[in-house]
Structure formats: C-alpha cells, structure tokens
Amino acid sequence: MLTRSLVLLPLLLAPALAARAQSTPAAPAMRMAVRLDAERHDLVMEIGPLELPAGSGHQQLPAFHGVVPMSGWIHGFRVEMVDGDGNAAPRETVHHVNVISPAQRELFSQIMLRVAAAGQETEPVALPRMIGYRVHRGQELIVTSMVHNPTGQAYHGVRLRVHFPCTPSSAVVRPVSVLPFYMDVMPPASLHSYDLPPGRSRRSWEGRPAVAGRILGVGGHVHQYGTALRLEDVTAKTVIWEGRPMVDHEGRIVSMPVARFLWTLGVPMRPDHLYRVTAEYDNTSGQTIPGGAMGALAGLFVPDAPARWPAVDPGSPELKLDWRLVHTGNQGGHDHEQGHAHAPPATHGTH
C-alpha cells in the first residue's frame, strides 16, 4: 500500500525538514508504462521502480491498468526483473505475474480473461508466429504481481517487465487467432491459495467450457511440495494432460512441463463434457502450511466458432467478485491491501 505523506508538521520542525527535503530527493513513484518496440516486434509492460531489500517477504503490487498501443497478435510472453543499473535481478524475486483482459471473459467461468500468468519457475512462453492472441489498439489490460527477495542481496530501482513478441495487423500473413483459458482447483472468483495439510492431499474443481473448440497447449503452476497437476475429461474418462514439477537438489520447484498439441491439430473440448483440474501435494514438513498450496492451469484454445464466445456479463456476481479480488490483491490468498479498487465498467465488449 502506498504510504500517505504527512502534510501537517509542527512549525518548529519545518526549517530542518525543508532543508533535508532539498538535499534528499523523493523516491520516484511506482507506475506502469506500456511501450511498443516496433523494430523488435516487442510489446513491453514495465512496472517500477521497486525496492527489494535482502531477505524481504512478499510484496503485493497495485493492480496497474494499461492500454495496448497497437493492433495485431501477441505470440507468448516472458518476464524479467532489471535493477537500477540495468542488470538482471534473480528470477526468484518474482512470485507471480498476471495479465488480465477485463473486456473478455474466461472459457470456464464469468471471470475476466487471463491473458498471461507466470511464476518464478515459468520459462518464457514462445508461440509459433502462425498463431497468436488478438489485441486491439486501445484495449485495456490489467497487470497484477507479487514480488519478494529471498536472496541475501538487496536490489534497488528494480523494474518488472513483461515482454510480448507481437505481429502488427498490417502483416501480410495473418496469424490464426487463439484465446487463452484458465482453470484453478479453487472455485472461480475466489482465493487461489489454500491451506496445505501435512502428508498427501489433493484438491479438484470441475467445470464445462462455454463453447466448443480445441486445446493447442497447456501448462500449470503449483507451490512447494506439489507433486502433480492434472487435466481430465471426466465425461470421456481420459487424462488430457498431467504435469509433474521439476525440483532442484533442495526440493524447490524450478519448472513445470508444458504440453503442446499443435501438430495433432489440438485436443477437442466440448461444452457437453465435464472437465476436472486436480492438484496433488505431498507435504513432508509435518505441519499445516497456511495458504501453502495452489493449483492453476492455463492453456491455449481455438474456438470452433469464435463469434459464439460469450460476452462479459457486467451483472455477474462472479465478475464483480473477481474484479474486487484483483484490485485488493487477494487473488493469491495473501492478505495485502493495494492500490485503489475502481468499480468494474458498466459494459464490456469482446475483442
């Protein structure tokens, strides 16, 4: 939360404080900038500057709203942290980043469309140039993020950057438009993290897609002690994907596998089928870890009939709750206040 400035001071202290203010310039305010590097075909969303003291805990940043400066397609994303000297900060200083399109809804629920999501174990996501997520000049995007610094070194003037490789709408060869989709083991528009009991455990959520289409790829995110994340077609009794995290020699998760179904023309998904996402954990600590578990899945989807993708329903209780959670920093289950929570727009349109 941004601290408020003290505006009324004892009169006797005013001269000394005024002199100090002249010699110590105020730290620049954190903000988000959106820019397009047309030569490199790189759309960049940058948040900063941030201060990351050594060993600092979780810091939920405000939900920043930005506007896309171009029309075209984006082909994946990557996240980087750069300090005030232009040097790369460790990837583990990023807890998570989410990019959200408030004018579009999700495939499995009424919540806002999650365009990109990354944790510290997320590798850069690169899509073939023949497919991409369609963006339009003036389209609003929201970026939510959490940072921390588990290292023994402080980092100053840090900037969090989300890079989107892109193709302009003027391109001769137009990519096939795809849409991201998101599923979570917690119900839509709720806290994403939950208490992790000791020993083996699992948690699931089930839902039906709003429209028919094909899954082109899928990946996911779990926390420490996570052993598997799975997507199933319950109706067909088949496992579409199962990912098991890679860990280092200390048991810390360093990456999650990603499945791609491009060359098989995708995995069919039907609205008359029920789908389940399941997270499995093996907590060997012997204690319940408050908010210690999470199971989130994201993928790429090509609808059979894009025009049938439902519009956002401004009156949906699910959407209103999602908007509030996004703007109070509680998506991940961490109790942090942040920014100013504006009311959701009265109407939305699809892109």
What do the PLM-derived regions correspond to, one by one?
Residues 1-3:
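N-terminal secretory signal peptides that target proteins for export/translocation
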